[in-house]
């Protein structure tokens, strides 16, 4: 599976790196992808999500249950 955002589908973009003499060489710009655990359909899964989707709360992160304190 390619490294693309699970939420928005953002992947690498391609273009040219330009030197001072304007010689063009191909390069790629990668999105800021983070591997996070999300809840989906009652199940927890680890997926790649871009930082802008995490900041915009477009995915629901999974939280680990806190064990009950013994009294």
UniProtKB/Swiss-Prot annotation:
Listed InterPro entries: Bacterial_rp_bL28, Ribosomal_bL28, Ribosomal_bL28/bL31-like_sf, Ribosomal_bL28_bact-type, Ribosomal_bL28_sf
GO cellular component: ribonucleoprotein complex; ribosome
Gene3D superfamilies: Ribosomal protein L28/L24 (2.30.170.40)
Superkingdom per UniProt: Bacteria
GO biological process, one term: translation
UniProt entry keywords in alphabetical sequence: Ribonucleoprotein, Ribosomal protein
GO terms assigned for molecular function: structural constituent of ribosome
Pfam families per record: Ribosomal_L28
Family: Belongs to the bacterial ribosomal protein bL28 family.
PANTHER family registered for this protein in UniProt: 50S RIBOSOMAL PROTEIN L28, LARGE RIBOSOMAL SUBUNIT PROTEIN BL28A
NCBIfam families associated with the record: L28 (TIGR00009)
Name assigned to this protein: Large ribosomal subunit protein bL28
Gene that encodes the chain: rpmB
């Amino acid at each position: 599976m390619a490294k693309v955002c699970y939420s928005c589908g953002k992947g690498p973009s391609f273009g040219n790196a330009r030197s001072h003499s304007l010689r063009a060489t191909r390069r790629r710009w990668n999105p800021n992808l983070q591997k996070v655990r999300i809840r989906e359909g009652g199940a927890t899964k680890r997926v790649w999500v871009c930082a802008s989707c995490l900041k915009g709360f477009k995915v629901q992160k999974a939280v680990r249950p806190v064990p009950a304190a013994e009294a």
